[in-house]
Amino acid sequence: VTLTLYLVRHAPTLPNAERRYPLLEEDAPLSPEGREVAGRLRLPLQAAAYTSPKLRARETAKLAGFPHTFTVAALTEADFGLMAGHTWAELEARFGARPREWIEALGHPEGETGPPEGETGRQFHARIQNWLAALPGEGEVVAFTHAGPLLAALRLCVGLRAAEVALGGVVVLKRAQGQWWLRELRLPHG
């Protein structure tokens, strides 16, 4: 009894090109480049497909060949609080070293803090853990999501603390007998 989980980071958007943290209410569409990247994704089309409610994830799914998906709020990006709408350089200029501390706390499953006015590490990881626990016991699942939930799943499933997954990148995990394995990290086809 095996589950194969394909975690897909949505394809590029204009805010991604600007390298700023997304606003919680922001719902940016894919950029022209993002539409091309999404159209080149190769995923098992018979798999059950889940998507974040955000347009960028839903468009990635549709262009990858998944017109019918289950929308799951748990797959939404982390709530970055007052970091949202700003670039890393802007945050460092305004807050010094504190943004690094906020992101490290958000990236820790037991983190009691996170970005001010945003999620704590514990809240964020609990949201992802609850979604992972609700997945079927076998078959194939494709989830179109964001960097934060994808990285949280890697931390929770295989203990990977640091990774960089490109926009349009895919992480393949396998679960058998209650144990997760990392099977593959795919770069977007270019």
Predicted regions and their residues:
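Active-site-proximal alpha-helix that buttresses catalytic centers in soluble enzyme cores
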Residues: 2-70
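Short, active-site-adjacent cap segments at secondary-structure transitions
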Residues: 14, 56-58, 77-78, 149-151
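Short beta-strand scaffold positions
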Residues: 51-52, 126, 144-145
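Domain-level recognition of soluble alpha/beta enzyme cores
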Residues: 159-184
